[in-house]
């Protein structure tokens, strides 16, 4: 078992790397705001729409179906995120890993069928 000093010695390079990464990314985000010249112009503050004046307010309401499609995309994107590492390590995880992923896919398929039957995907 590792002692506290050995544990600190093992994780010190990771902590230093994380600290440098936070410092550099913060510096990269703050430096342009500090060094740039700010020239405000009325034309720069207006919305731009293909060279024309905007036809309507940019804050118009979207149909809820767009949000449903976006949520479906996120759900199935997460499914692929879990499915690829599972497929790669299928030989080592055994039957428990196989059946747990089958249960996960079953729940997703049931949810998809429910949305389909309720008409969430009909336009």
Curated annotation (Swiss-Prot):
UniProt function note: NDH-1 shuttles electrons from NADH, via FMN and iron-sulfur (Fe-S) centers, to quinones in the respiratory chain. The immediate electron acceptor for the enzyme in this species is believed to be ubiquinone. Couples the redox reaction to proton translocation (for every two electrons transferred, four hydrogen ions are translocated across the cytoplasmic membrane), and thus conserves the redox energy in a proton gradient.
Database matches in InterPro entries: NAD(P)H_OxRDtase_bac/plastid, NADH_UbQ/plastoQ_OxRdtase_su3, NDAH_ubi_oxred_su3_sf
Transmembrane helix in keyword set: yes
Protein name: NADH-quinone oxidoreductase subunit A
Encoding gene per record: nuoA
Family: Belongs to the complex I subunit 3 family.
Subcellular location: Cell inner membrane
Pfam family, any one: Oxidored_q4
EC number: 7.1.1.-
Organism (species): Rickettsia typhi (strain ATCC VR-144 / Wilmington)
């Amino acid at each position: 078992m590792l002692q506290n000093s050995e544990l600190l010695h093992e994780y010190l390079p990771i902590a230093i790397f994380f600290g440098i990464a936070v410092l550099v990314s913060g510096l990269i985000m703050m430096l342009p705001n500090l060094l740039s010249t700010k020239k405000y112009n009325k034309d720069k503050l207006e919305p731009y729409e293909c060279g024309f004046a905007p036809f309507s307010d940019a804050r118009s309401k979207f149909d809820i179906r767009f949000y449903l499609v976006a949520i479906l995309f996120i759900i199935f994107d997460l499914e692929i995120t879990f499915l690829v590492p599972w497929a790669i390590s299928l030989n080592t995880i055994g039957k428990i890993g196989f059946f747990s992923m089958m249960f996960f896919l079953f729940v997703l398929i049931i949810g998809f069928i429910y949305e389909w039957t309720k008409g969430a995907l009909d336009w």
